[in-house]
């Protein structure tokens, strides 16, 4: 693996993720993402879909290790009962909406998700995200949209 991580490449036409269908987020993209948004590094952050730890490695560069919580399949984020100041992740695309809705409830301050802008294509998904009163103003919408 290179410093930039693996590239996102193949399409998966089934609704089940293949075990080999794993793509780490490039370190450089995570750094750019974190630099584009303001975070208080004295507060807690959770990465609930850490995979092999690419985003977590960068989070540990920005935060003290004791403030970073990271897990993957061993804990189901959708059943999470704890709260964190920030949620930062590249969620599984097929359940990204469920991750967003869960993050609205467990992130004390904000959440930041790495998703393609095309994720908002489709009226139903867009309406569900933006009709929520907590996301209806432009500053709150930055919870999950950061232009890179």
Label the predicted regions:
Residues 1-148:
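Class I S-adenosyl-L-methionine-dependent methyltransferase catalytic core
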């Amino acid at each position: 693996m290179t410093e930039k991580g693996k590239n996102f490449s193949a399409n998966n036409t089934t609704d089940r993720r293949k075990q080999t269908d794993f793509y780490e987020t490039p370190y450089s993209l995570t750094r750019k993402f974190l630099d584009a948004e303001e975070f208080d590094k004295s507060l807690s952050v959770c990465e609930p879909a850490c995979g092999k730890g690419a985003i977590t490695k960068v989070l540990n560069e920005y935060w003290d290790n004791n403030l970073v919580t990271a897990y993957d399949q061993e804990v189901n984020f959708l059943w999470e009962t704890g709260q964190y100041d920030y949620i930062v992740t590249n969620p599984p695309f097929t359940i990204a909406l469920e991750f967003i809705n869960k993050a609205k409830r467990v992130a004390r301050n904000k959440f930041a998700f790495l998703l393609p802008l095309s994720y908002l294509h489709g009226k139903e998904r867009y309406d569900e995200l933006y009709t929520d009163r907590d996301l209806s103003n432009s500053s709150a919408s930055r919870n999950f949209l950061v232009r890179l």
